[in-house]
Regions:
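Short, aliphatic-rich beta-strand segments
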Residues: 49-53, 81, 263-266, 316-320
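Hydrophobic alpha-helix feature that most strongly marks membrane-spanning transmembrane helices
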Residues: 283-286, 293, 320-323, 337, ...
Length: 389
């Protein structure tokens, strides 16, 4: 490579270089300072700070690095501020200093992962936050965030918490008036009353219970504009969805109220998921267009008595993951192909690891009658990268 090619990158405007460096972890961005005098201070113009404790030898070294970066960074606006300390404890005064500095620079996206998290008062009313991820792995400490949250611009909220901090998570959710995407993962909580969340702006919802044996009282979500839903089936009992009164249907036998707006549904496999519960979900989502499911762990196939409305009118794509090629898998797939009238694509991810078994499944399904004449079948597995009918 000639010298002109080498200089082409170095001669770019500082604004362009800072955007490039902002796309990489901050530790790597700082390392570019040794390339030449031209590069020595380019990293100080980054608009994203992304620091993970893992590459450092000890939490104290990582904390010192964060201090140094914030002292030298010249950007007046931080688009992304991400700190990942796993379950390690960071001194409260130090964490408060970092968060306040990010807020001073009008942080847009904030992600924090640590063992014990105490938020400064200034965080509760941040007007620039649009995306927030909080992961608190502490299981022994109880933190009570007393001050109400008011995050007027927050549209994406991702929470991972254990035990009592779940109550704090609920306080946080209620302080986001324009929330569009919510992901909530936690073990369980104790509360005498059911918790009700009215979020008319919500479009995407993901609910995961980390441990199935922990008690969890009922959660009710009033979400009239929901489009995407991802659940593990541990939520069948303690979870309800409601819409505005004009859209609420009577409770069906399924795990959800009938939710006419959902277009994307993803179901994770666990001890509660079975073929019957899958179709209960489908019955609840009449406008469903895209379905992703993992194979139930143990369940005998029982053909539904009626075909869900979404399969007759709207269901366009199906992703079936962890397929073992067993009898119940084949019966389910044949049923979907034979009854989904507007299906365009079904993608099957095989997990058997046996070439002969996977190829037999492929051959059988390619010969299976399809109600939708435009439906294609894609296979993904060790025996083939993909095969499309």
């Amino acid at each position: 490579m000639g010298s002109k090619d080498v200089d082409r990158l170095s001669n770019m405007p500082n604004e362009v270089l800072s955007e490039i460096l902002s796309l990489m972890p901050t530790k790597l961005a700082v390392r570019t300072s040794i390339l030449s005098k031209r590069w020595r201070y380019n990293w100080t113009l980054v608009t994203s700070i992304d620091i993970d404790v893992l590459p450092f030898h000890g939490v104290e070294n990582c904390c010192a690095f964060v201090d140094r970066v914030l002292d030298l960074c010249k950007s007046t606006e931080i688009k992304l501020f991400r700190l990942r300390f796993s379950n390690l404890w960071v001194q409260e005064s130090r964490m408060t200093k970092w968060i306040n500095e990010a807020l001073r620079r009008k942080v847009g996206e904030f992600e924090i992962q640590c063992g014990l998290l105490e938020l400064p008062i200034s965080f509760y009313t941040c007007k620039t936050l649009t995306k927030l991820r909080v992961e608190n792995e502490c299981q022994n400490e109880f933190m009570d965030w007393q001050t109400p949250f008011n995050l007027p611009c927050l549209k994406t909220l991702d929470i991972v918490v254990y035990r009592h901090p779940s109550l704090n998570a609920f306080k946080l959710i209620r302080g986001c008036p324009v929330l569009e995407s919510l992901s909530l993962q936690f073990t369980g909580y104790n509360n005498d009353n059911e918790d009700i969340f009215s979020i008319p702006t919500l479009k995407r919802l993901k609910l995961i219970r980390k441990l199935k044996w922990r008690s969890c009282n009922k959660l009710v979500f009033i979400v009239p504009n929901l489009e995407d839903l991802c659940l593990d089936s541990r939520w069948c009992s303690p979870f309800e969805m409601e819409e505005l009164p004009s859209l609420v249907s009577e409770l069906s036998d399924g795990p959800l109220r009938k939710v006419v707006t959902i277009k994307h549904l993803e179901l994770k496999s666990d001890d509660y998921l079975c073929w019957e519960s899958i179709f209960q979900y489908l019955e609840s989502c009449s406008q469903l267009e895209h379905l992703t499911i993992e194979k139930p762990r143990e369940s005998d196939w029982i053909e539904p008595q009626t075909v869900p409305t979404c399969m007759l009118m709207n269901l366009k794509t199906i992703k079936f993951e962890n397929c073992m090629g067993e009898k119940d898998d084949i019966q389910f797939l044949e049923y979907m192909l034979g009854n989904a009238e507007v299906l365009k694509r079904i993608t099957i991810t095989c997990k058997s690891g046996l070439m002969e078994k996977e190829l037999q499944l492929c051959a059988r399904l390619l010969k299976c009658p399809r109600t939708s004449k435009y439906c294609e079948i894609n296979f993904v597995g060790k025996s083939f990268d993909s095969a499309t009918s």
